[in-house]
Regions:
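Structural motif
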Residues: 9, 18-20, 125-126, 193
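Solvent-exposed alpha-helices and their adjacent loops that cap or buttress functional pockets
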Residues: 10-14, 91-92, 187-188
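Short beta-strand segments
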Residues: 13-14, 21-22, 101, 197
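Core active-site phosphate/anionic-ligand binding loop and the adjoining beta-turn-alpha structural block
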Residues: 16-69, 73, 77
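C-terminal charged capping/lid subdomain of soluble metabolic enzymes
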Residues: 40, 142-224
């Protein structure tokens, strides 16, 4: 229950920050795998809503991987600006904010399947999930087959996971992974909503996606 005092009411109000401070130098303290896992979330912003940013990431892959300070500043600042704009426009996640979940429904299923262990870090799951989302989009005729191929290559160039079979150890089959996906919060009335794309930088909310199509792209990723 929210306290009645005016001071307490002020505390509970939503207020977007007027300033975000990021100490980029801390990124240089991370182990390589942790750094690259974080990059999965950066690449997501280009994939969901900014084609030019994704092109910039491709062109600057080596600088980013080498942790060039100017490249890191650009990547982090642009990601923060994109997230801020999306959250401000949709604070209660009624629409556009859901785009931030690109790759995450696949990721959450893989995290559950791997026991939330070191076998797959969250950002690695986001990268794999983003590839799967574009694979599914291509399979549904929403985007070209070149898009998921291009995204896979970019993650490979960055030294990152880009398919389910990159994950060590035994994994459940496609039926079980889809079952895990249906435990996600984005299931509404028993129907799975996913973030898909009509091209790089053109993500949208797809409702009631056919589970059989999802199984197909998962099976392909397991077999690669």
């Amino acid at each position: 229950t929210q306290p009645e005092s005016s001071a307490a009411s002020d505390v509970y109000k939503r207020q977007q920050p007027s300033l975000v401070i990021s100490d980029i130098s801390t990124l240089k303290t991370l182990e390589e795998r942790d750094f690259l896992a974080g990059y999965g979330e950066v690449a997501k912003y280009g994939l969901l809503g900014d084609y030019e940013f994704f092109c910039w990431l491709e062109e600057n892959a080596e600088n980013i991987r080498n942790r060039d300070i100017n490249a890191l500043i650009t990547a982090v600042a642009h990601s923060c600006k994109m997230k801020s704009a999306i959250v401000i426009a949709d604070e209660k996640e009624q629409g556009e904010r859901a785009l931030l979940n690109l790759g995450h429904t696949f990721c959450h299923a893989l995290e559950a399947a791997t026991g939330y262990s070191e076998r797959m870090l969250h950002g690695e799951g986001v990268a794999i999930g983003s590839v799967l989302a574009f694979d599914l989009s291509a399979k549904m005729g929403l985007t070209s087959n070149e898009d998921p191929t291009r995204i896979k290559k970019h993650f490979e160039d960055m030294g990152m996971m880009n398919s389910i079979n990159n994950i060590s150890g035994t994994l459940p089959n496609a039926d079980k992974l889809v079952e895990l996906m249906f435990q996600d919060k984005k299931v509404v009335d028993g129907k799975l909503n996913l973030i898909l794309a009509k091209g790089i930088g053109k993500a949208f909310i797809a409702r009631d996606v056919d589970p059989n199509l999802i199984k197909d792209v998962i099976n392909n990723s397991l077999a690669i």
